[in-house]
Amino acid sequence: MSEFQKVVVIDAKGHLLGRLASVVAKQLLGGQKVVVVRCEELNISGHFFRNKLKYLAYLRKACRYNPSRGAFHFRAPSRIFQKAVRGMLPHKTARGQAALEHLQAVEGIPPPFDKQKRVVVPAALRVLRLKPGRKYCTVGRLSSEVGWKYSDIVSKLEERRKVKSAAFYQAKLAKQKKIASAKAASSVNGKLAEFGY
């Protein structure tokens, strides 16, 4: 992500939460608009039970006499990711708030972004950064265990999207094949070569 683009869409599947958050935070401070899709597929290193215990301990942090004052703990994977990024930004300054407004994180791949080119961040990919055999868990599973209710809906919508995109890809391949065969069959190129073009 060295060159500046209007909006960068990152597919979060298979990325480590903290490593991706640090890269995104750096880009946001540079003025780049970033959209992170499939936040439920983010990974956290360490086995699931340990991460769940850590999250439950985090949920116990609240105002003693009036819990509605805060601290507020989000259960949705997209909000967990946003909070991780916020911790890496100077969010109490105008510059940090402006950077945070350029971030959009969502579960699944909703319609505006399913037609856009998605990128990955090699510096944050689990397969490249985590030693083979190490335990890890997904943010989606952790979220659904601590109160996120929309895991089934997101997975159902994702299955539907994958079927549509597979059909689109097959149609695209068929079209490319037709164009290639038409180019091979045409004798126009030969005629043009005869006349020196």
Swiss-Prot record:
<comment type="similarity">
    <text>Belongs to the universal ribosomal protein uL13 family.</text>
</comment>
<dbReference type="InterPro" id="IPR023563">
    <property type="entry name" value="Ribosomal_uL13_CS"/>
</dbReference>
<keyword id="KW-0963">Cytoplasm</keyword>
<dbReference type="InterPro" id="IPR036899">
    <property type="entry name" value="Ribosomal_uL13_sf"/>
</dbReference>
<dbReference type="GO" id="GO:0005730">
    <property type="term" value="C:nucleolus"/>
</dbReference>
<dbReference type="GO" id="GO:0005840">
    <property type="term" value="C:ribosome"/>
</dbReference>
<dbReference type="GO" id="GO:0005829">
    <property type="term" value="C:cytosol"/>
</dbReference>
<dbReference type="GO" id="GO:0002181">
    <property type="term" value="P:cytoplasmic translation"/>
</dbReference>
<keyword id="KW-0539">Nucleus</keyword>
<keyword id="KW-0689">Ribosomal protein</keyword>
<dbReference type="Pfam" id="PF00572">
    <property type="entry name" value="Ribosomal_L13"/>
</dbReference>
<feature type="modified residue" description="Phosphoserine">
    <location>
        <position position="151"/>
    </location>
</feature>
<dbReference type="GO" id="GO:0017148">
    <property type="term" value="P:negative regulation of translation"/>
</dbReference>
<dbReference type="GO" id="GO:0022625">
    <property type="term" value="C:cytosolic large ribosomal subunit"/>
</dbReference>
<keyword id="KW-0687">Ribonucleoprotein</keyword>
<keyword id="KW-0597">Phosphoprotein</keyword>
<dbReference type="InterPro" id="IPR005755">
    <property type="entry name" value="Ribosomal_uL13_euk/arc"/>
</dbReference>
<dbReference type="GO" id="GO:0003729">
    <property type="term" value="F:mRNA binding"/>
</dbReference>
<dbReference type="InterPro" id="IPR005822">
    <property type="entry name" value="Ribosomal_uL13"/>
</dbReference>
<comment type="function">
    <text>Component of the ribosome, a large ribonucleoprotein complex responsible for the synthesis of proteins in the cell. The small ribosomal subunit (SSU) binds messenger RNAs (mRNAs) and translates the encoded message by selecting cognate aminoacyl-transfer RNA (tRNA) molecules. The large subunit (LSU) contains the ribosomal catalytic site termed the peptidyl transferase center (PTC), which catalyzes the formation of peptide bonds, thereby polymerizing the amino acids delivered by tRNAs into a polypeptide chain.</text>
</comment>
<dbReference type="GO" id="GO:0030684">
    <property type="term" value="C:preribosome"/>
</dbReference>
<comment type="subunit">
    <text>Component of the large ribosomal subunit (LSU). Mature yeast ribosomes consist of a small (40S) and a large (60S) subunit. The 40S small subunit contains 1 molecule of ribosomal RNA (18S rRNA) and at least 33 different proteins. The large 60S subunit contains 3 rRNA molecules (25S, 5.8S and 5S rRNA) and at least 46 different proteins.</text>
</comment>
<dbReference type="GO" id="GO:0003735">
    <property type="term" value="F:structural constituent of ribosome"/>
</dbReference>
<protein>
    <recommendedName>
        <fullName>Large ribosomal subunit protein uL13A</fullName>
    </recommendedName>
</protein>
